[in-house]
């Protein structure tokens, strides 16, 4: 067993962030706090991802299901068919192979915990 104290986990910049459609607020940024260091689990990857106002992941897909637990702010999640607003306490289940994006709304930051299968 291991207790991870989030306040002690390094915040690492993520090189890419994509603005939400219609964003005019300049460059957008996001950061990651790896909850489980690489190789710490045979089965899971988990991080906290922090999005500044208007920042998203851009369209992407995973080789496994993904769980997002919204921990701060207000954001959006979208697949090719719909967009939905998410806020603190919401949990999102994204299927393996589902093209999607997630991030902050233009007027709010957003943070979530992400859980995927280790590859």
Where are the regions a protein language model picked out?
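Conserved short histidine dyad/triad with adjacent acidic residue
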Residues: 45-62, 96
